[in-house]
């Protein structure tokens, strides 16, 4: 990422404590993630990372499942009225994306995906005994033109 953006990437901190560098996700047979978005500008207004604009999410696929586990990315970004369709625990009603076009990304080991986390997305069910394994993190520019990553 440093070479791509020609900037040094620094791990974001909160009260002088660093965020994790990345998150390892293991999705097993039957696992899925319903419609959601990940941008923390609205979710976490008191946190330093919520102040970073133009946030992006990076996902590196380490292992592909035999079947399933595709990432479905909808051509719809979050807006405040969508909060009426929010699930109390996590994510949104699938109706929030009704009528939206979408792209499907297969989780192919070795592929790196960078996306705008403000677009709604979901993970289709993994089928079979081979797990879907990925590493993910967020990154963004600060107002003083520095690049930060966190998870």
Residue ranges and their predicted role:
Residues 1-29, 46-47:
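Signature of the catalytic double-stranded beta-helix
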Residues 26-28, 75, 117, 137:
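Pocket-edge structural micro-motifs
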Residues 24, 58-60, 135-139:
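A structural signal for short, well-ordered beta-strand segments
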Residues 22, 54-56, 111, 133:
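Residue-level detector of short, conserved catalytic/binding motifs and their immediate flanks
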Residues 29-107, 148:
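Catalytic core of non-heme Fe(II) oxygenases with the double-stranded beta-helix
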Residues 83-151:
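Catalytic core of Fe(II)/2-oxoglutarate
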Residues 15-16, 68, 127-129:
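A short beta-turn/loop motif at secondary-structure boundaries
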Residues 26, 62, 125-127:
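Short, low-complexity Ser/Thr-rich regulatory SLiMs
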């Amino acid at each position: 990422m440093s070479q791509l953006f020609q900037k040094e990437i620094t791990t974001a901190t909160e009260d002088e404590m660093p965020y994790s560098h990345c998150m390892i996700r293991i999705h097993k047979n039957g696992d899925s993630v319903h419609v959601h978005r990940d941008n923390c500008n609205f979710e976490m207004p008191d946190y330093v990372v919520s102040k970073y604009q133009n946030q992006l999410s990076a996902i590196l696929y380490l292992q592909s499942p035999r079947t399933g586990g595709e990432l479905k990315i909808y051509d719809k970004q979050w807006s405040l009225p969508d909060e009426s369709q929010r699930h109390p625990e996590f994510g949104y009603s699938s109706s929030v994306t009704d009528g939206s076009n979408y792209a499907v990304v297969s989780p192919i080991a070795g592929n790196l995906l960078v996306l705008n986390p403000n677009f709604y997305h979901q993970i289709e069910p993994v089928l079979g005994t081979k797990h879907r394994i990925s590493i993910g993190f967020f990154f963004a520019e600060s107002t003083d033109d520095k690049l930060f990553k966190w998870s």
